[in-house]
Amino acid sequence: MALYERVCPRVLVVVKPGDESVQDLVTGPCEWVVARDAKVGISRSIAAGIRALGSAPWVIIGLADMPYVSPDTVSQIARTLDGGAVIARPSSRGRTGNPVGFNSRLFGPLMDLKGDLGARALIDDYIRDVVDVEVRDQGIFRDIDRPEDLT
């Protein structure tokens, strides 16, 4: 979570019930949120995080299985949001990745998401408001699904 601590005023880690033990694996200051209905899909985890965040100018939604994102990428997303972007997402060579930032104007729609597609549909709905932030960071595409992915 150090990746986000440098840039974000608050870092919230959303877990499903029973996964609180991951707290032992995370260093640094963060707030823990349990998404009671996480089994419904990632949309419920996003909603739980937004609810817990409360009042903030923006949120950057990062995925725990993407530890190779560069801190510079997170900084660029935050600066783009500070500049007034509604949605800011990293892009490299025409491909978009994660994490994605959202202006507080979209907190309501983020809490209304359904299923396990994350915010993809919301991004599509607001495509004219999306700022693609060009980065040189392949970590925006690299996720960890198995222990061997860490090498």
Question: Where would I find each of the regions flagged by the language model?
Answer:
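Phosphate- and divalent-cation-binding pockets in alpha/beta enzyme and binding domains
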Residues: 21-22, 109, 143
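Conserved beta-strand segments that form the floor/walls of ligand-binding pockets within enzyme
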Residues: 65, 101, 143
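Nucleotide and nucleotide-moiety/phosphate-recognizing core
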Residues: 1-96, 128-135
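Pocket-edge positions in alpha/beta enzyme catalytic cores
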Residues: 34-37, 99, 111, 142
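A general structural signal for well-ordered alpha-helical segments in protein cores
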Residues: 43-46, 74, 107, 116-120, ...
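Conserved alpha/beta core of the MobA/IspD/sugar-nucleotide pyrophosphorylase nucleotidyltransferase superfamily
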Residues: 112-151
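Short, glycine-/small-residue-rich phosphate/pyrophosphate-handling segment
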Residues: 2, 95-126
